[in-house]
């Protein structure tokens, strides 16, 4: 969640040898289990599969649950990529054939993608892990599944936002490596809401906004999302906690509407 493995079970946190963590270039272990840890990904797949089977059984005949989010704002905070032993070995290998063909490049990750190599490497790793998890769950109950993005923002370098997460620049990698996800969805807490809406709405990626600020200015963008971009979802975060009387809701300042 939010670039860290804060909600994994205690027994997994304690066994950091089997469920190994990502590392910074300095060797410092992070609070994020590495996406290169097959044992951890397999446990996640098994848990998600059981959850989907439970929903199928409990929601039979009702259809209350219409979509599932897999993970939350996935990625790696504090470094552009994982430097653990397994990650180092993978990073030194040649890029996957599908990416070589897609980008018309070749060689190792560093040779193929230069300064973007770390983020592209992590995008492929996280997307591949989510594909294993998602496809397992959908075998139990084929609900539409998506994952959400912590958006790029100042200071704009990978690791200041979760590196490898589904930001727009790596959508091609995510779409290739995680085809079971019907949408890559933005969590919008930035002022340039319209630009994000447009960036995440394109053929092959229906607009699905699972989180957006719950203020007066942002509320108006729901019309733009639904009418201009045919959004499937526009969900102000924590709206159920607002509970304000209409006269108590903050109104946009008049000057903000002036050209």
Residues of each region from the PLM?
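Short intrinsically disordered, low-complexity coil segments enriched in acidic
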Residues: 1-12
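Short secondary-structure boundary/capping segments
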Residues: 7-8, 82-87, 91, 162, ...
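Catalytic-core region of carbohydrate-active enzymes that cleave or remodel glycosidic bonds
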Residues: 132-142, 169-259
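Polysaccharide-binding and catalytic clefts of secreted carbohydrate-active enzymes
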Residues: 13-171
């Amino acid at each position: 969640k939010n670039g860290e493995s804060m909600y994994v079970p205690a027994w997994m946190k304690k066994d950091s040898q089997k469920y190994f963590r990502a590392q910074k270039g300095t060797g410092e272990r992070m609070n994020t289990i590495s996406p290169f840890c097959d044992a951890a990904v397999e446990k996640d797949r098994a848990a998600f599969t059981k959850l989907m089977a439970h929903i199928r059984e409990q929601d039979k005949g009702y259809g209350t649950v219409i979509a599932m989010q897999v993970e939350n704002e996935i990625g790696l905070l504090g470094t552009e990529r994982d430097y653990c032993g397994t990650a180092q070995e993978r990073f030194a290998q040649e890029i996957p054939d599908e990416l070589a063909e897609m980008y018309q490049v070749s060689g190792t990750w560093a040779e193929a993608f230069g300064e973007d190599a770390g983020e592209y490497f992590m995008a492929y790793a996280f997307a591949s892990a989510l594909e294993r998890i998602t496809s397992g769950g959908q075998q139990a109950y084929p609900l539409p599944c998506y994952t959400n993005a912590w958006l790029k923002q100042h200071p704009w370098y990978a690791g200041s936002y979760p590196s490898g997460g589904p930001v727009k620049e790596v959508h091609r990698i995510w779409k290739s490596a995680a085809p079971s996800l019907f949408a890559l969805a933005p969590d919008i807490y930035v002022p340039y809401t319209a630009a994000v809406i447009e960036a995440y709405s394109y053929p092959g990626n229906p607009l699905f906004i699972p989180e957006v600020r719950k203020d007066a200015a942002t509320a108006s963008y729901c019309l733009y999302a639904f009418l201009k971009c045919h959004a499937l979802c526009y969900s102000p975060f924590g709206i159920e906690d607002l509970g304000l009387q209409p006269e108590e809701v903050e109104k946009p300042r008049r000057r903000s509407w002036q050209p």
